[in-house]
Every structure is written in C-alpha cells, then in structure tokens.
C-alpha cells in the first residue's frame, strides 16, 4: 500500500511538469529534476554512494531513501559546492520518503536529520515511510 501511494505521488509530481517537455529548451529548465544521489548496494563500493534519489520540483527537493553519503552527495550538487541545483542545498532538505527499512536505505537518516538542522534548515524534516520509520527517527533524536 505504501509503495503504491509513494509511486502515485511521484508520478503526479512528475506529470505536472509534462508541458515543459513540449518546449525546445526543456532540458535547460530546473523546474523538475530527477537526481540520482546514490546507486550503490549494501556492499561498500568506494566509488558509489548508498541508494538515494531526489526529485526537485520548482526548487523543492523530495528525497527518496537515504543511503550512506546522501547529505554530502546532495550538497556536492548545490551551488555552494560548485553544483548547479539550488534545491539540493543542505538546508533545503525538508521532505524525505523511505521505501523500506533496510540498512542500505536508512543509514543516512541521522545525517539527514542532524546535519541539515545544524546548517540552517528552518523546519523539522517531514519524514514518510513504512511502519517503524517514526521509531527510527525518534531514536536518532534521543
């Protein structure tokens, strides 16, 4: 049920931007971007970050899964560190979705909760996920 809801929400977000594809310069637009922040596996490959992606809609990032290095990967793509995606500045990481609670998808959660807060996120992280997600986040904050 949760995965269906998540996939439906993501499809709606992306489909709202469909008219952009009709213009000649849609690739230059930053209205909607799908950014692979990590494509790694549970194995600790040094050249791959853990599984995570960001859907950036009108500059607002929505993270899906938070493998190892998610905050650093996002920040490396922000203008502060030489990237071009303003929405991925650490203080903008405010919406997060977990698909499941395997460690390779969750180990970046403490970094996402705490680092973004220390660098100026002005509201609590909005976290959505399967049963057990709230408990995990609460333990990080203890």
What function would you assign to each model-found segment?
Residues 21-142:
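Binuclear metal-dependent hydrolase catalytic cores
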Residues 15-18:
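N-terminal signal peptide c-region/cleavage motif recognized by signal peptidases
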Residues 11-12:
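Short, linear, compositionally biased motifs with a strong N-terminal bias
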Residues 1-7:
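Bacterial N-terminal signal peptides that target proteins for export
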């Amino acid at each position: 049920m949760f995965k269906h809801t998540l996939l439906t929400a993501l499809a709606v977000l992306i489909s709202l931007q469909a008219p952009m594809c009709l213009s000649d310069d849609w690739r230059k637009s930053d209205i909607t971007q799908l950014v692979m922040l990590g494509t790694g596996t549970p194995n600790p490959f040094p050249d791959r970050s853990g599984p995570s992606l960001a859907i950036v809609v009108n500059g607002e990032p929505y993270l899906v899964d938070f493998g190892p290095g998610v905050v650093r990967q996002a920040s490396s793509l922000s203008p502060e560190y030489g990237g071009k995606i303003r929405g991925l500045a650490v203080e903008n990481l405010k919406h997060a979705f977990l698909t499941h609670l395997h460690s390779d998808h969750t180990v970046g959660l403490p970094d996402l909760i705490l680092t973004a807060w220390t660098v100026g996120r002005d509201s609590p992280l909005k976290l959505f996920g399967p049963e057990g997600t709230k408990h995990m986040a609460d333990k990080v904050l203890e």
